[in-house]
């Protein structure tokens, strides 16, 4: 409701009109921001930390976090591997700059090399595949949980409902987090 007040001769006249309702996606976005803000504040977290990959899901979660909590309360971490494209790195860096959030880079290649060496006997005689891919995701979750445990921000998972419903995610990896803002949002709405 938009109201204009005029006072004339001791009489206050109010006139106004109702603003049009939000579009469905605008209302959904506002609801996602409200849900995250309420959860973080009611549970006493000083802020949030999330992995920023350069993809659309993590970009949307970062934007929701900034609108819900303010840029100072959002810490993004890029965790590149040998397979991370320069475009993904550039996109994540540009987004963090546009949102005004802290962005740190923690390369996972040294940890992957160490894990592959540690597991070489167990993985001997097999072709690289899903197990190795999942190690990368789990390393990223471990890094975010370490930051959370040390400094207190809650980890945000960046998966969406389509990924969770189809099982297209890694337990203890990209599902890692205290809150998943997109958990009830189908990929088509992301």
Enumerate the language-model features and the residues they cover.
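Flexible loop/turn segments at secondary-structure boundaries
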Residues: 56-60, 83-87, 105, 111-115, ...
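Active-site adenylate/phosphate-handling loop in enzymes that bind or generate adenylated species
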Residues: 99, 122-190
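Alpha-helix capping and helix-loop boundary segments enriched in small/acidic/polar residues
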Residues: 23, 52, 56, 79-87, ...
């Amino acid at each position: 409701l938009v109201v204009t007040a005029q006072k004339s001769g001791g009489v206050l006249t109010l006139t106004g009109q109702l603003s049009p309702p939000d579009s469905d996606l605008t209302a959904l976005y506002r609801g996602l921001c409200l849900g995250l803000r309420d959860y973080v504040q009611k549970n006493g977290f000083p802020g949030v930390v999330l992995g920023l990959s350069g993809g659309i899901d993590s970009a949307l979660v970062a934007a929701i976090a900034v609108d819900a909590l303010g840029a100072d309360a959002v810490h993004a971490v890029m965790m590149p591997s040998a397979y991370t494209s320069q475009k993904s790195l550039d996109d994540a860096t540009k987004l963090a700059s546009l949102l005004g959030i802290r962005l740190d880079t923690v390369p996972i290649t040294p940890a992957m090399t160490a894990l592959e060496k540690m597991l070489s006997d167990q993985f001997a005689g097999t072709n690289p595949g899903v197990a190795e891919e999942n190690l990368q995701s789990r390393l990223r979750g471990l890094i975010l949980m370490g930051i959370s445990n040390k400094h207190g921000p809650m980890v945000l998972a960046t998966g969406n409902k389509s990924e969770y419903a189809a099982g297209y995610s890694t337990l203890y990896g990209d599902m890692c987090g205290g809150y998943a803002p997109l958990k009830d949002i189908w990929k088509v709405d992301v």
